[in-house]
Amino acid sequence: MSDSPITQRKQDHIDWLLQDEKIERQQAGFDQIQLTHRGLPECDYAQVDSGTTFLQHSLSFPLLISSMTGGASNALNTINENLARAAEHCQVAMAVGSQRTMILDRKAEKSFQLRQFAPTVPLIANMGAIQLNYGFGYDEAQRMVEVLEADALYLHLNPLQEVIQPEGDTNFAKLAEKIAHLKNHLSVPIILKEVGCGLSEKDIQLGLDAGIEWFDLAGRGGTSWSRIEAHRTEDSQQAELGKMFQDWGLTTPQALKQARPFQSQAQFIASGGIRNGIDMVKSVIMGAQICGVAAPLLKPAMASTNATIGTIEQLQQEFRTAQFLLGMPKMADLFLNDSLIVP
């Protein structure tokens, strides 16, 4: 393990995610959405097509391996390599964890040199938007894109995590105008992303005003970063604060509803608490173009590429089966199709 504090932080995050089962909140709200089963689906399961496109790439089904990790250690390198190889094999998209670590510690770049393992699928670079208020700008963002050979850049928004985090950066003032400036100069599209508290109508409007066309809504109900950071702090009062806010925010279904008025102006990724292919189908019906999944892939990625592939293939089979049982053999049949939801 590198002595880099930021790499150690990345390892801490993974360790706590594995150790504390309550970090997975299991309150995403998808169970409250019921779909209309078709006993006579009038389609052939063998002909069900879950394929879609994302960032000018074809995907086998609308899965994005969502941001997890990266840093200057063999363990973190292995996770990212296994995820990238699995993404290529299964023809799904992949986003990396925050790349700030590779700007502060050049040894961490290896963790993000993934195009060699995933030559034909979308890869998304990742920077905390808050860093635009702490000295980062175009040069750092473009470097992240170039190292990954990325198709887009996540700018992640994590105000709750930063407030709880011992090393947190909390000046979010006038950030939208800096996002707009970066958007106008970067070589790839920017995707504005929360990390587990959801994006509201006002957030989406601010993003649109800044020229952003893609949003990852990342609602609550899955991994609680507030609870993870509560474990990391040595300040007992701060730890209690983290646990108090562990269920703060909009669920992913709630965020999708808030995004509905903007469907003609932007495209949306659903993530946060998506744990199976049925959740994915529900998200597409509610307006998601792509669905991000992270935590269910962490343990497989720590084990092997094949284990990761197996988990992705299970998600795909669940997605296709739900499509079939809804009588919707094409992806386009699902999108914003409210008639599939039981009133």
UniProtKB/Swiss-Prot annotation:
Similarity annotation: Belongs to the IPP isomerase type 2 family.
Essential cofactor(s): FMN; NADPH; Mg(2+)
InterPro entries xrefs: Aldolase_TIM, FMN-dep_DH, IPdP_isomerase
Localization of this protein: Cytoplasm
GO biological process: isoprenoid biosynthetic process
Function: Involved in the biosynthesis of isoprenoids. Catalyzes the 1,3-allylic rearrangement of the homoallylic substrate isopentenyl (IPP) to its allylic isomer, dimethylallyl diphosphate (DMAPP).
Keyword Magnesium tagged: yes
Broadest EC class assigned to this enzyme: isomerase
Main location: cytoplasm
Binding site for FMN: S66, S67, M68, T69, S98, N126, K193, T223, G273, I274, R275, A294, A295
EC number(s) on file: 5.3.3.2
GO CC terms, sorted: cytoplasm
Residue positions binding substrate: R9, K10, S98, Q99, R100, Q161
Protein name, as recorded: Isopentenyl-diphosphate delta-isomerase
A single GO molecular function term of this UniProt record: FMN binding
UniProt KW NADP keyword: yes
Encoding gene per record: fni
Amino acids binding Mg(2+): E162
Keywords assigned by UniProt, alphabetized: Cytoplasm, Flavoprotein, FMN, Isomerase, Isoprene biosynthesis, Magnesium, Metal-binding, NADP
Catalysed reactions, semicolon-separated: isopentenyl diphosphate = dimethylallyl diphosphate
Oligomer and partners: Homooctamer. Dimer of tetramers.
